[in-house]
């Protein structure tokens, strides 16, 4: 029956029809192609019937509005929206408890506010549940419950590590290399998120495909693009695949970043440096054994902490980053390879 409501609507030239509420171009109704009969819906829609008040384009639009109102009057519509929001921002799994204690109140807020999204966002993002403070059950973690999309993985790295972006006016060629070849061509294209070109009209599988959802972004075909990102940043090249030595138009100077970013309170102290980096990079701080893996095995490479302190002081005095670049590079690779870093 709903399909009958849509009969007679078609494309129109962009400038001919402007929607009065949104001020954006809209399609056009052609009454000669519309089914003006009464549309009788099932018990799931309370046996509602939709009939046109007039047999012209205004009547067609009235039917369309009636169909929209009928759909939004259903409690399940609001719940569906809120489930989609929950899976986008919190976690892919919705248990019966979450459905009753989180989704249902959000849906009620959605309906009570005439389907305005902001009150729902405020309620969700301000809840104890969102910050994983509503219980002590370690088996239902909210923080770190979502796998980053390739876009999130790349842009968060660019922002956090303060990667210098080439100026599009004075460094036009490098700007194109950075975005077209580096970000779009290598990280996103091979990472399973060819930007603006989803595989079908439903969008990217990571946002809707059950039961995996965001796990769709992390598989045997896309993992290389994710794990080669630190090498791309440190070498300033595509790092892998065709033309692996080609420049991406910029390069990450990690020693200068550690020195100048203001993130690290005492870079000379290896323990403090690793601790503060992990606090920023991971959803939650790792436990003792995991932390020691990054500090002792990766960063210090089994050497005494004093070795790093000496190398850092020497770097500050001479500007030569040869010795500090090696342990910092090991640490960056290990952190960005870590499962924890792939989570948000």
Regions from the PLM with identified roles:
Residues 1-96:
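Non-catalytic, conformational "gating/processing" segments within enzyme and secreted inhibitor domains
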Residues 74-113, 122-344:
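Flexible, low-complexity segments enriched for small/polar residues
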């Amino acid at each position: 029956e709903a399909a009958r409501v849509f009969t007679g609507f078609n494309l129109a030239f962009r400038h001919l029809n402007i929607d009065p509420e949104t001020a954006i171009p809209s399609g056009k109704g052609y009454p000669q192609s519309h089914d003006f009969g009464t549309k009788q819906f099932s018990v799931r829609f309370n046996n509602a019937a939709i009939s046109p008040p007039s047999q012209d384009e205004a009547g067609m639009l009235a039917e369309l509005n009636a169909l929209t109102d009928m759909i939004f009057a259903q409690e399940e519509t609001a719940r569906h929206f809120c489930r989609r929001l929950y899976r986008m921002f919190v976690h892919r799994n919705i248990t019966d408890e979450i459905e009753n204690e989180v989704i249902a109140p959000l849906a009620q807020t959605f309906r009570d506010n005439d389907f305005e999204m902001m009150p729902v966002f405020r309620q969700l993002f301000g809840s104890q549940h969102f910050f994983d403070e509503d219980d002590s059950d370690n088996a239902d973690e909210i923080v770190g419950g979502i796998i980053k999309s390739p876009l999130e993985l790349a842009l968060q790295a660019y922002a956090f590590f303060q990667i210098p972006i080439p100026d599009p006016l004075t460094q036009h060629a490098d700007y194109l290399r950075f975005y077209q070849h580096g970000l779009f061509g290598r990280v996103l294209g091979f990472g399973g998120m060819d930007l603006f070109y989803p595989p079908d009209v439903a969008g990217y599988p990571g946002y809707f495909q059950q039961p995996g959802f965001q796990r769709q972004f992390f598989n045997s075909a896309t993992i290389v693009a994710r794990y080669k990102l630190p090498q791309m940043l440190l070498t300033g090249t595509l790092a892998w695949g065709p033309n692996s030595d080609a420049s991406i138009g910029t390069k990450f100077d990690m020693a200068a970043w550690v020195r100048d970013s203001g993130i690290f309170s005492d870079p000379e102290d290896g323990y403090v440096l690793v601790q503060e980096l992990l606090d920023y990079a991971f959803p939650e701080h790792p436990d003792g054994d995991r932390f020691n893996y990054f500090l002792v095995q990766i960063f210090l490479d089994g050497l005494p902490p004093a070795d790093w302190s000496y190398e850092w002081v020497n770097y500050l005095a001479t500007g030569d980053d040869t010795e500090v670049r090696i342990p910092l590079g090991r640490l960056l690779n290990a952190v960005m390879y870590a499962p924890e870093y792939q989570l948000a």
